[in-house]
From Swiss-Prot:
NCBIfam families: PRK01777.1 (NF002490). Pfam families: Ub-RnfH. The gene is rnfH. Belongs to the UPF0125 (RnfH) family. This is Protein RnfH. It comes from Haemophilus influenzae (strain PittEE). It comes from the Bacteria. PANTHER family: UPF0125 PROTEIN RATB.
Amino acid sequence: MNQINIEIAYAFPERYYLKSFQVDEGITVQTAITQSGILSQFPEIDLSTNKIGIFSRPIKLTDVLKEGDRIEIYRPLLADPKEIRRKRAAEQAAAKNKEKGA
């Protein structure tokens, strides 16, 4: 069976894990992730909750890989971006009201 070259990436705030390797043509994303060994290196990765993509495009674990694909495993968000914006806006409004009252 023919082999294809792929990469698997997992990013942290302070560092980046990237591994290049060859897999059999026709392999699925999930099988490649399992074969890469990344799940034993980073036990916090949970394929049922972590989002997965190829070059920033969301994919399914059942998708078949192509030559040169880079599987990206995304960490869960620590906070909801909408909630952070609401909180920041409320804090800024409170600060403006305080300045007007002073």
